A protein has these predicted regions:
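N-terminal secretory signal peptides that target proteins for export/translocation
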Residues: 1-10
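A detector of low-complexity, intrinsically disordered, Ser/Thr/Gly/Pro/Ala-rich segments
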Residues: 2-3, 21, 314, 685
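Intrinsically disordered/low-complexity terminal segments and short unstructured peptides
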Residues: 3-4, 22, 446, 860
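Intrinsic low-complexity/disordered segments
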Residues: 7-8, 26-28
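Bacterial N-terminal signal peptides
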Residues: 11-25
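Low-complexity, glycine/serine/threonine/alanine-rich intrinsically disordered linker
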Residues: 28-59, 74-898
Length: 898
């Protein structure tokens, strides 16, 4: 052990001490519980409690209550922090007497021995499972896979709270009155979207446009609905009196300008999936074919390339009931420099909307019931649906209650749902004081004919009915509703059930102290929400039904990460782990934005921000699917860029024609990708659609980039809106990558922005002035060098040699005296910290996978996962497989602590 402490700073890793590794894996001399009283407590009282005791708690650290092993074990994170600061020499502070080397070494071994002894002898503890509500993302994706309904259901939902860095933590995913209200309203909307029971019609073909002919011209530019000036093909403005009206019928219209040609259609009778067909023909000028986007209510639903002949292009899109605005937009406008009268354009012959088409949701819901009739059909549909919705076999009692929804529909007009009726209906108690805070609805939100709980009378005797439900407005008998409508009532009841809204893990041994495996259905849910953020698919259900999922976890991991739905690991895990959601709130100084119009590329900050996230998402998703090393996150020789990013990075050519050697698109096997195969992300999870501004996989050899640290998404969230921030970048690397965040800054220390006298100095000198404060120097010695190494990248990720008139200095010196120059050398140092990085990533992913924070007893589990990761050459599949095979993931225990 002496090599760790002698001398205190010289032999330490340059970033931080991997304390978990040292505690867990290094041999320690024999210790016993008496060392707490003989060694640990006296050392703390002598060197620590004056600043971290009952009277003072500097840095929010108090050590005076740690009097025995049990207290020390529960404060494991605190003691890791104590040992780290002792080893680095940060504590005791310079003004306090330092402990002798032998004294500090004995104290360190005594603390470590407490944890080593526990890790080697304690019973396995998978942690306590908390029943948790589906968060917004899980809810929407589950509805999508359960019913095929893809509408933004969660827009009006309150934001999910975060704990331990993620929004899927069970302890905070409770049910508030507002959320309950939203779920009830959403259930009604979902059923209306999933089951079409009204009249369905195909809207007739409606063409709009009109070829406009002028003397000496073939076409004049359109004068669209937004009032753009109409010009003839010689560029001259057309006088109002000479403009010809658009012709009706099947005539066409040629347009050149950026604005879309659009048409407001009549109200759609029902929401649903509609087919939009555009008949288009290209007007060719220049080397490229005209490229178009098909629009529905202002959103792109299809992109494509026109030919010289008129052809039909179609897309199926979900539309809401009511009016809809359809249009076509030219994406690559071009004017011949030699002849301004020649402009690229598109001829729109017709635009047609048909629908709703046969709904996927009804195919999903009613699949297999085509040959059944009556109650047999109803029972089959409900049993299959409820089993999938509850992620487990539906019980006999549950099924009978659902059957009564269908059989008794129409007996009661409607009632206002109350907290009491919700609890009575689902035989469930609302958590906390939710029921007490719910107010009776003053206005019934449901229609008289369509009650999702009409069978409530069947669960209560008639004499009790009036007493239990005084809010019933009308009990008039009504004629039976259509079968689809009555099925819809039961579906709504399922979607409001706690068994659907919560991830409930039923256990036949809920109070058993010993750890035991969870059921296969529960394991299927844990696996699918971890890797896909949605419900299990049929293969997982089948394995669970045969009780074979526990034995097939490695094969399922391999299958599931190859599935497009595994993109959820980026969208929900990596986005939160890396802090990338903050990019949605970031707005740079407009003066610092690139002029894309000057660079002949379309886009604004929103477009560029989305491009940044797409690059990181495609990069991370490939690492997972193709089983790369986790170390490639730090430095890799490829990334994904589109035209805007190629111009921003000056990195290669996706029609950006930038200055560096052209970076040709390659696939994961290293082979070039033909342009026709270049793909861009689509709207659904994990799929990619053809695009005129495609993302391509490019080789980064001989460039200045590679890995997360040089991607615009990371460089931007670690900057200020007006400048870079070495402090934010260094802090991000310590916290997000290495898992060794510095403590919060001391109170009453002015921020860098608050130091007016230093504002006129270059950034490096401003920080040097800031570090003169002794309260700041220690932490900034760790933070700042990491950020300074990346100063060549500006706040948007562009490479630069100067900051204004000041040359960039990317050289720096680590806290251990090691000199580093630039991003490549710093990435090599960070990549060398395999233990720190792999342990931090393991801990973060385990928190996300289990939906709970880690505790002192989880260190043994983490150690085992890290060991498997090392054996697997640090590959992603090794990490994920080790997590799903760990006790924390596939086992549970009762509420009492073992």
């Amino acid at each position: 052990m002496g090599h760790i402490m002698r001398p205190l700073k010289q032999y330490l890793p340059c970033l931080a001490l991997p304390l978990f590794v040292a505690i867990a894996d290094e041999p320690c001399r024999a210790q016993d519980a008496s060392d707490v009283a003989k060694v640990i407590v006296p050392f703390v009282e002598k060197h620590c409690v004056d600043c971290h005791g009952e009277k003072k708690q500097k840095g929010d650290l108090s050590l005076h209550l740690f009097k025995d092993e049990a207290a020390i074990l529960k404060g494991r994170k605190t003691w890791n922090r104590v040992l780290e600061q002792l080893a680095t020499g940060e504590m005791p502070p310079s003004k306090r007497p330092k402990p002798a080397f032998n004294e500090a070494e004995r104290f360190t071994e005594a603390v470590k021995s407490v944890f080593v002894r526990f890790d080697r002898t304690a019973k396995r503890d998978p942690g306590l499972v908390t029943m948790r509500r589906l968060n917004k993302v899980e809810y929407v994706s589950t509805i999508r896979d359960l019913l095929g309904v893809s509408i933004p259901l969660a827009e009006d939902f309150p934001a999910d709270q975060m704990g331990h860095g993620f929004d899927n933590i069970g302890d905070i995913l409770t049910l508030s009155p507002l959320q309950l209200e939203r779920y009830l309203a959403s259930a009604e909307s979902i059923v209306k979207a999933a089951i079409v029971t009204g009249d369905v019609r195909d809207l007739p073909k409606q063409s709009f446009g009109g070829s406009q002919q002028f003397e000496g011209t073939k076409y004049g530019q359109k004068y669209d609905d937004r009032g753009r000036i109409a010009r003839d093909d010689k560029g001259k403005q057309i006088p109002e009196k000479e403009r010809l009206p658009a012709l009706s019928g099947d005539s066409s219209r040629l347009f050149y300008d950026k604005g879309p040609l659009h048409k407001r259609y009549n109200d759609l009778l029902v929401a649903g999936d509609y087919r939009i067909i555009a008949k288009l023909q290209g007007h060719f000028v220049g080397d490229e074919a005209p490229k178009f986007a098909l629009l529905a209510d202002g959103k792109e639903v299809l992109q494509g390339v026109c030919t010289e002949k008129a052809e039909e292009y179609s897309a199926t899109v979900r539309l809401k009931a009511g009016p809809v605005d359809l249009g076509v937009s030219l994406l690559n406008e071009f004017t011949d420099p030699a002849d301004p009268t020649k402009r690229r354009g598109i001829i729109l012959h017709s635009l047609t909307i048909l629908g709703p088409t046969v709904k996927e949701s009804q195919e999903i819901l009613f699949a297999g019931s085509e040959k059944l009739e009556g109650d047999a059909k109803t029972r089959f549909v409900l049993e299959r649906f409820a089993t999938r919705a509850y992620r487990r076999p539906v019980t006999k009692d549950e099924l009978e209650r659902l059957m009564r929804f269908v059989q008794q529909a129409g007996k009661i007009s409607h009632y206002r749902l109350s907290a009491e009726s919700f609890q009575k209906l689902h035989a469930a108690k609302l958590p906390g004081d939710v029921a007490g805070r719910l107010k009776p609805m003053e206005k019934d939100p449901f229609t008289d004919e369509d009650r999702f709980v009409k069978s409530i009378r069947q669960r209560i005797k008639d004499d009790e009915f009036k007493n239990h439900f005084p809010t019933i407005l009308d009990a008039a008998e009504k004629s039976p509703q259509p079968w689809e409508t009555r099925i819809g009532l039961a579906v709504r009841a399922v979607l409001c059930s706690p068994s659907f809204l919560f991830r409930v893990e039923l256990d036949s041994r809920p109070t058993e102290r010993e750890a035991h495996p969870i059921g296969d259905y529960q394991l299927a849910s844990r696996l699918s929400y971890f890797l896909w953020n949605t419900m299990p698919d049929q293969e997982l259900f089948d394995l669970a039904a045969r009780q074979q999922l526990h034995q097939n976890l490695p094969a399922q991991v391999k299958r599931m990460v190859a599935d497009p739905r595994s993109k959820a690991l980026f969208d929900s895990f990596a986005m939160q782990w890396l802090g990338l959601r903050r990019l949605q709130e970031f707005t740079p100084d407009p003066k610092l934005m690139p002029d894309f119009s000057r660079l002949q590329a379309r886009g604004n900050w929103t477009d560029l921000r989305n491009d940044m996230l797409t690059e990181t998402g495609l990069f991370f998703t490939e690492l997972v699917r193709e089983n790369h090393s986790i170390l490639d996150l730090i430095d890799a020789r490829f990334t994904y860029i589109n035209r805007r990013l190629s111009l921003l990075y000056d990195i290669g050519d996706t029609n950006g024609n930038s200055g560096l050697p052209k970076a040709r698109p390659i696939n994961p096997a290293g082979k070039p990708i033909p342009d026709i195969q270049i793909l861009e992300r689509g709207q659904d999870s994990g799929t990619f659609a053809r695009s005129v501004n495609p993302f391509v996989r490019v080789n980064l050899e001989n460039t200045r980039r590679g890995g997360l640290f040089t991607q615009a998404s990371v460089l931007t969230i670690t900057s200020h809106p007006t400048r870079t921030s070495p402090v934010k970048r260094g802090h991000w690397m310590l916290e997000r990558i290495l898992g060794t965040p510095p403590p919060p800054p001391p109170p009453n220390v002015p921020s860098l922005e608050g130091q007016k006298d230093a504002a006129r100095l270059p950034l490096r000198q401003q920080l040097e002035s800031h570090r003169k404060n002794p309260n700041c120097a220690g932490c900034h010695a760790r933070i700042d060098p990491l950020g300074f190494a990346f100063e060549n990248f500006d706040l948007l990720g562009r490479f630069r040699e100067t900051d204004g008139d000041t040359p960039i200095d990317a050289s720096t010196e680590m806290s251990n005296g090691r000199k580093v120059n630039g991003p490549e050398e710093m990435k090599a140092i960070v990549r060398g910290e395999k233990e720190l990085f792999s342990r931090n990533l393991t801990e973060k992913m385990l928190v996300y996978a289990t939906g709970r924070g880690l505790d002192y007893y989880d260190v043994r589990t983490v150690n085992g996962i890290v060991a498997e990761l090392q054996k697997g050459d640090y590959r992603f599949h090794a990490l994920i497989t080790a997590i799903v095979q760990s006790d924390a993931f596939r086992m549970r225990r009762g509420k009492e602590q073992p």
